[in-house]
């Protein structure tokens, strides 16, 4: 009976847990890190799993992310759109939804040719008037969509509590 001996420093291409790179961890159109090109000694282990991409470098954390915040006085949506020019972006309100769409046709960059397109939708809360929503694009490529929240009608007032002499719950009649 022959027994196959596998050395831990030799990669086995069909080992079920082998995952030298994950397709969904890639940031297409972004620069490569040295760790993307060269294997480390730990990645040679058949049990090595590449850490999620958000552990890679601080500059990757804010790439392509969006954030929706409800602040005390306004709705605020921030979206990283640094790969798009203002002419390639559209922001519109349809009913109670903010739609952001970005698209640019194929163009050449330092790695080859790339085209991008995205759609994002955000539900507008009931206390934000859709007609008051505005958007702006910063110099570093962050699209901000704002909408002021409606103020509560009237000033705050304290409601006094009165005491009644009869109970709120009475016993059910006996049969």
Swiss-Prot record:
GO molecular function, one term: unfolded protein binding
Binding site for Zn(2+) 1: 83, 111, 119
UniProt-listed GO biological process terms: negative regulation of apoptotic process; negative regulation of DNA-templated transcription; protein refolding; response to heat
Location (main, coarse): cytoplasm
Cellular location(s): Cytoplasm; Nucleus; Secreted; Lysosome
Nuclease recorded as keyword: no
Name the UniProt record assigns to this protein: Alpha-crystallin B chain
Organism of provenance: Spalax judaei
Taxonomic lineage from the root: Eukaryota, Metazoa, Chordata, Craniata, Vertebrata
Gene coding for it: CRYAB
């Amino acid at each position: 009976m022959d027994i196959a001996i596998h050395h831990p420093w030799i990669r086995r291409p069909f080992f079920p847990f082998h995952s030298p790179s994950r397709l969904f961890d890639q940031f297409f159109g972004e620069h490569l890190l040295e760790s993307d090109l060269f294997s480390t000694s730990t990645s040679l282990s058949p049990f090595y799993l590449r850490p999620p991409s958000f552990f890679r470098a601080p500059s990757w954390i804010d790439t392509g992310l969006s954030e929706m915040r409800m602040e005390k006085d306004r709705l605020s949506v921030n979206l990283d759109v640094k790969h798009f020019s203002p002419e390639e972006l559209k922001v519109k309100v349809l009913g109670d939804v903010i739609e952001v769409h970005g698209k640019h046709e194929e163009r050449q960059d330092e790695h080859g040719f790339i085209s991008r397109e995205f759609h994002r939708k955000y539900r507008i809360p009931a206390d934000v008037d859709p007609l008051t929503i505005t958007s702006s694009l910063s110099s570093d490529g962050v699209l901000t969509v704002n909408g002021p929240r409606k103020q509560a009608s009237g000033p705050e007032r304290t409601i006094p509590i009165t005491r009644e002499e009869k109970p709120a719950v009475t016993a059910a009649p006996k049969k």
